[in-house]
């Protein structure tokens, strides 16, 4: 260990070309509220020297135009203004580190949910707005240059995948050429100021699209087309919003190769489980184009409270006058020390598997049934039988050629306006039923409703326990709930073979935020979060997107064109087909045939009631073997699936399935 210490300390310390960075713009606020940063031995030191001692070499600072404005970030103390930035940048430079400046072009936070125009620029549009942004950018950079603390890298905006300086610079999925030109005109005003004042400083474009390759290409291609420049591609990556690690890896590898630019994960939420994973992924980018990473506000992870009073968090307002001593965490800093020790060897190859491509396969034609009502029926005394012999309902279905069972899941059916005070279709009831499905040797499709009760084209009520969430908070909750639920099923031995991320969602989900209006953008983010939640738990589980448009081709195409353009990752197209809403059998056949030819994805009629043989035959005969099968809805209900009578006995309709010799 002595030799290791000598290698990494002292004047002769080797340097890695890979940058280990962080955004710690909260530091002045923490220190103003009494925080004292200490090294592992409890010796007070400047936080930047502590970080530099552990191989951090690049610190990013955000800057707001006027945080003291009425609706600004820090009306009383002006944190993240120019003066605070100057003072902090001097400390960064004194610690021997590089400095990245992150222009938010707002008086407060700017991110994909919001890009508020600074109060000083209200009323400005067009060239006047561009001139204001140019003058502000030039003034800030000139000040930093004259103070001897010019940044090595500059971001023209923060997480600007939906544009910057709204409303003029706003872009969404319906953005026209003129919208892009306006937004990029604003961007180029900042670009011009950077190039004039600091011609050697790198420009980093910052998009909150860690795993969204399609959207990254769309954005960067528009930039190039309109003369907007970038030297480094910077991406935010937070697991709950930006897809899986494999998606991140795939995106970084592709973007670096396609644009021949370095790539940087310039925001991630560092924790002991993901630091090495994310850094190794970026370090593994071919041709040395993995620039590095920047952990976002990691002080609460890097430091621990000596007395437990803070547990590493920033003190809250009202705690002024107190002293909080935070010691450097040997565990977390040790992770960074270890990866640095590996990265200084230019021949070191990160232990990262190449990006993998999902394979979509199905061995048998699906003859499926939704039997989510069964636990309620059984609790009320229903005994199921076939040809006079009483059997478990799953055995009866299997005897009649059924091989796949669909079960719906509500978030909390016992809530005030929920589906069932007894908890039917809740997690525990659904899990118990799923175990029975697996024990019967059948496959299992899990149908997330993302509601406490029925979700369909006419209603998509947000769960009661989620009403406190909005914006990115609700999107993150979709990911967490999906991910945790799938992990629970897997841990209990009831792994779903396929998952629906929403039920009949052609009008959106989780209303009002996820309701489809003129824009699919909020809904698209939710759907991406749901998909990522499944794939992060088990990348081999098939993902279905389910709409209720069995015979409506125009609506089906419009929907799937949009979600594909919004980078939603899914494997199977699911359609409901009820003749009174979805047209004739010819309408169904024509729609499914077109979808198969157009998208090349497997299709399943995941809900139907009538025309049992005809629907199955239509799906079976779709082009290129893409008709995977069907699920009859509520097979045990005399009113719906009607394969059993009210007493639980099979009826003549069941015999149809024995004739489906697929």
Regions found by a protein language model. Give the residues of each.
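Active-site cleft segment of glycoside hydrolase catalytic domains centered on the general acid/base Glu
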Residues: 75, 80-84, 110-228, 241-251, ...
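Hydrophobic faces of well-ordered beta-strands that scaffold small-molecule active sites
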Residues: 20-24, 57-61, 99-103, 152-156, ...
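Anion (oxyanion) recognition and catalysis
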Residues: 52, 93, 195, 257, ...
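Aromatic-rich peripheral "rim/lid" segments of glycoside hydrolase catalytic domains that contact
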Residues: 32-33, 254-260, 272-361, 587-590, ...
């Amino acid at each position: 260990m002595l030799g290791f210490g000598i290698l990494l300390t002292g004047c002769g310390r080797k340097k890695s070309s890979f940058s280990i960075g962080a955004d710690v713009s909260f530091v002045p606020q923490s220190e103003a509220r009494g925080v004292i940063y200490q090294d592992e031995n409890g010796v007070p030191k400047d936080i930047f020297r502590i970080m530099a001692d552990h191989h951090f070499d690049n610190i990013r600072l955000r800057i707001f135009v006027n945080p003291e404005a009425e609706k600004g970030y820090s009306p009383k103390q002006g944190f993240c203004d120019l003066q605070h930035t100057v003072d902090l940048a001097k400390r960064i430079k004194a610690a021997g580190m590089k400095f990245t400046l992150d222009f938010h072009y707002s008086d407060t936070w700017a991110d994909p949910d919001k890009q508020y125009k600074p109060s000083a620029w209200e009323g400005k549009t067009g060239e006047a707005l561009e001139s204001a942004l140019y003058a502000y950018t030039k003034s800030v950079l000139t000040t930093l240059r004259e103070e001897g603390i010019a940044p090595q890298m500059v971001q023209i905006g923060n997480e600007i995948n939906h544009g910057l300086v709204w409303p003029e610079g706003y872009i969404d999925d319906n953005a026209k050429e003129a919208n892009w030109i306006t937004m990029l005109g604003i961007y180029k005003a900042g670009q011009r100021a950077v190039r004039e004042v600091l011609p050697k400083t790198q420009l980093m474009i910052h998009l909150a699209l860690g795993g969204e390759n399609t959207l990254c290409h769309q954005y960067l291609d528009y930039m190039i087309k309109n003369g907007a420049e970038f030297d480094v591609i910077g991406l935010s990556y937070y697991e709950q919003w930006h897809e899986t690690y494999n998606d991140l890896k795939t995106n970084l590898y592709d973007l670096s190769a396609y644009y021949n630019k370095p790539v940087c994960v310039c925001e991630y939420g560092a924790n002991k489980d993901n630091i090495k994973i994310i850094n190794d992924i970026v370090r593994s980018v071919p041709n040395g184009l993995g620039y590095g990473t920047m952990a976002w506000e990691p002080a609460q992870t890097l430091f621990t409270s000596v007395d437990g009073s803070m547990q590493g968090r920033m003190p809250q307002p009202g705690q002024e006058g107190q002293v909080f001593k935070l010691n450097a965490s040997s565990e977390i800093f040790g992770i960074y020390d270890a990866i640095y020790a590996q990265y200084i060897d230019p021949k070191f190859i990160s232990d990262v598997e190449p990006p993998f491509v999902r394979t979509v396969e199905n061995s048998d034609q699906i003859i499926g049934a939704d039997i989510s009502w069964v636990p309620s029926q059984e609790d009320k005394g229903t005994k199921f039988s076939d040809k006079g012999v009483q059997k478990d309902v799953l055995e009866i279905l299997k005897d009649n050629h059924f091989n796949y069972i669909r079960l719906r899941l509500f978030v909390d059916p016992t809530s005030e306006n929920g589906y069932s005070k007894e908890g039917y279709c809740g997690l525990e009831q659904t899990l118990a039923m799923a175990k029975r499905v697996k024990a019967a040797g059948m496959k299992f499709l899990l149908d997330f409703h993302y509601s406490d009760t029925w979700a369909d084209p006419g209603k998509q009520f947000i769960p009661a326990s989620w009403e406190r969430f909005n914006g990115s908070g609700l999107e993150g909750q979709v990911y967490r709930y999906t991910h945790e639920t799938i992990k629970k099923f897997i841990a209990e031995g009831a792994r779903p073979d396929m998952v629906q991320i929403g039920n009949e969602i052609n009008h959106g989900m989780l209303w009002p935020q996820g309701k489809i209006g003129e824009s699919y953008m909020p809904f698209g983010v939710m759907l991406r979060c749901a998909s990522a939640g499944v794939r992060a738990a088990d990348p081999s589980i098939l993902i279905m997107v389910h709409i209720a448009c069995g015979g409506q081709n125009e609506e089906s195409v419009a929907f799937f064109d949009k979600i594909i353009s919004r980078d939603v990752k899914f494997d199977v197209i699911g359609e409901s087909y009820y003749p009174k809403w979805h047209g004739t059998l010819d309408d169904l056949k024509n729609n499914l045939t077109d979808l198969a030819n157009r998208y090349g994805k497997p299709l399943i009629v995941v809900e139907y009631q009538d025309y049992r043989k005809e629907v199955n035959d239509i799906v079976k005969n779709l082009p290129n073997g893409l008709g995977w099968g069907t699920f009859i809805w509520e097979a045990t209900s005399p009113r719906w699936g009607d394969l059993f009578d009210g007493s639980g006995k099979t009826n003549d309709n069941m015999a149809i399935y024995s004739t489906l010799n697929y």
